[in-house]
Amino acid sequence: MLSFFKTLSTKRSAWFLLFSSALLLEAIALYFQHGMGLAPCVMCIYERVAILGIAFSGLLGLLYPSSMLLRLVALLIGLSSAIKGLMISITHLDLQLYPAPWKQCSAVAEFPETLPLDQWFPALFLPSGSCSEVTWQFLGFSMVQWIVVIFALYTLLLALIFISQVKRLKPKQRRLFH
């Protein structure tokens, strides 16, 4: 199984799939915000940034997937983004499932001073919604429950691929004649 993931990580198509799936999730989030009028909360914005980290890792791996160093850097970025996104989305889910006056998220995104995404790109990163409010459901699950599943899948997949990097692939036997 690990050799399958190792081989997969050396193919551009796998990295393109990671990149495009994360971009698709970003596009869906923007449709929910601008098309359906659902206001994103601070946690939603942080989850978007984590998805962008996964997209960046996919783009990085897409550049030169046969380089072990670049693959490891891309996997570390993607895995740390997926884990951070999972942690944020679980906290967000806790706010939705067990709302209380003393458990509220901030009304303002707290980005570093050197990277104020909410000021540079307010249409993408300016929060205006409530973290504890459930505004959309699909198949009985809220958007946050779906994003927890998505981040868990990204974390599992990227962890397996990262672990598989220590596995040596069998060298291809080149035969001149069959």
From Swiss-Prot:
Q: Which gene encodes it?
A: dsbB
List the disulfide bonds in this chain: 41-44, 105-131
Q: Please give the Gene3D superfamilies that the UniProt record associates with this protein.
A: DsbB-like (1.20.1550.10)
Give one GO biological process term. Answer: protein folding
State the family it belongs to: Belongs to the DsbB family.
Look up and give the membrane topology term: Multi-pass membrane protein
Tell me, what does this protein do in biology?
A: Required for disulfide bond formation in some periplasmic proteins. Acts by oxidizing the DsbA protein.
Q: Known PANTHER family for this protein?
A: DISULFIDE BOND FORMATION PROTEIN B (PTHR36570:SF2)
Looking up HAMAP family in the UniProt record yields:
DsbB
From what superkingdom does this record's organism come?
Bacteria
Q: Which residues lie on this side of the membrane: Cytoplasmic?
A: 1-14, 66-72, 165-177
Q: Which organism is it from?
A: Pasteurella multocida (strain Pm70)
Q: Which UniProt keywords apply?
A: Cell inner membrane, Cell membrane, Chaperone, Disulfide bond, Electron transport, Membrane, Oxidoreductase, Redox-active center, Transmembrane, Transmembrane helix, Transport
Q: Does the keyword Zinc apply?
A: no
Q: Where in the cell is it found?
A: Cell inner membrane
Q: Principal place where this protein is found?
A: membrane
Q: Enumerate the SUPFAM superfamilies for this protein.
A: DsbB-like
Kindly report every residue range on the membrane side named Periplasmic: 32-49, 91-145
Q: Which Pfam families match?
A: DsbB
Q: Which residues form a coiled coil?
A: none
The transmembrane segments are: 15-31, 50-65, 73-90, 146-164
**Cellular component terms (Gene Ontology):** plasma membrane
**GO MF term list:** electron transfer activity; protein-disulfide reductase activity
* Identification of the protein by name: Disulfide bond formation protein B
